C-alpha cells in the first residue's frame, strides 16, 4: 500500500512547495486538484505545450507519483444542484453550469491521459449543497 496526500489541503501554496513538503513527511503519492481556480493546477493550461510532462517531472523529482486528479467542485455541477448555492463555483443557468462542469471534468480526464494517471475523482452532486458547506472552503 502507498500513502498519498491530497494537495488541495494546501491550495494556497504552490504545487511544488506542497510536493516537497509531503515528500519530506514520507508520503509517496500526490492527488492533484484540477477544478477551476484551485490555485495549483489548471487542467486546460497544463494540456498546452508539454506543461503536463513538466508537472509530472516536478512531482517525480520529489520522489512522488501522481495517484489521482480530483475535480471536486466543477464536476458537482454536472448533476447539480444548479441554484444560487453553486454560483460560487460557476454562475450561470442550469445548462451553462452543466456545460462548464462537463468540460472541466473532460479536461481533467484529458490531463490524466497525458500524465498517464488512471484515476480522476469527481463529485456526483448533492441536493441543497449550500446547506452543508461552502466550497471551496471559507478563509
Regions found by a protein language model. Give the residues of each.
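Active-site beta-loop-alpha junctions enriched in small/polar residues
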Residues: 6-10, 33-37, 71-74, 125-127
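Acidic (Asp/Glu)-rich catalytic clusters
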Residues: 19-26, 46-70, 107-116
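Extreme N-terminal starter segment of soluble prokaryotic enzymes
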Residues: 1-4
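Glycine-rich, proline-tolerant flexible connector loops at the mouths of alpha/beta enzymes
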Residues: 33-60, 124-132
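Active-site acidic/histidine proton-transfer and metal-coordination neighborhood
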Residues: 16-17, 61, 76-139
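Short active-site-adjacent helix-start/loop capping segments
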Residues: 38-41, 67-68, 75-80
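Conserved beta-strand positions in the central sheet of alpha/beta enzyme cores
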Residues: 31, 68-70, 121
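Residues that form or flank phosphate/diphosphate-binding pockets in enzymes
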Residues: 13
Amino acid at each position: 500500500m502507498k500513502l498519498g496526500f491530497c494537495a488541495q489541503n494546501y491550495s494556497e501554496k504552490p504545487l511544488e512547495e506542497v510536493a516537497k513538503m509531503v515528500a519530506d513527511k514520507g508520503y509517496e503519492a500526490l492527488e492533484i486538484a484540477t477544478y477551476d481556480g484551485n490555485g495549483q493546477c489548471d487542467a486546460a493550461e497544463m494540456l498546452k505545450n508539454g506543461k503536463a510532462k513538466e508537472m509530472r517531472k516536478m512531482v517525480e523529482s520529489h520522489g512522488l507519483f501522481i495517484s489521482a486528479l480530483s475535480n471536486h467542485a466543477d464536476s458537482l455541477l454536472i448533476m447539480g444542484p444548479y441554484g444560487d448555492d453553486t454560483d460560487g463555483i460557476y454562475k450561470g443557468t442550469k445548462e451553462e453550469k452543466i456545460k462548464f462542469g462537463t468540460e472541466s471534468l473532460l479536461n481533467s480526464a484529458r490531463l490524466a491521459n497525458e500524465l498517464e494517471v488512471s484515476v480522476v475523482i469527481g463529485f456526483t452532486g448533492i441536493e441543497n449543497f449550500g446547506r452543508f458547506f461552502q466550497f471551496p472552503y471559507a478563509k
